[in-house]
């Protein structure tokens, strides 16, 4: 049965014609579509989708319970995408800059982020800056690209 709900990502399209088919397993065509579908997944409480669309090498480090709690305890107020860009001549890497707004028991909040994404084997993945990647600069990249970490995802992680 088709949903008549408007997609939470802010596109104005119906959920089934927008992020819903990504939630059902169709790969997102680009990083912006993946980011929008991840926002929608937070709104809808789809923690399994959030985990599955995070870089596989980081998935074990995610706090599923905290993700579920944040999703359930927030009233999601909107998403604004500022830009989506491919940098460094590497089309399998992309940045999406966005602002997400929500309300919880502590009031209204907004979070602006420039998120990094990587494509591997036809699927885009979010590179979570809060979950470390255990790789030396000369090790194979955890995204499974076949490149060394220093020439691949290392350049897309925040420097601390």
Curated annotation (Swiss-Prot):
InterPro entries the record matches: NTF2-like_dom_sf, SEC_C_motif, UPF0225, YchJ-like_M
Source domain of life: Bacteria
Family: Belongs to the UPF0225 family.
Classification via HAMAP family: UPF0225
Protein name (Swiss-Prot/TrEMBL): UPF0225 protein PP_1119
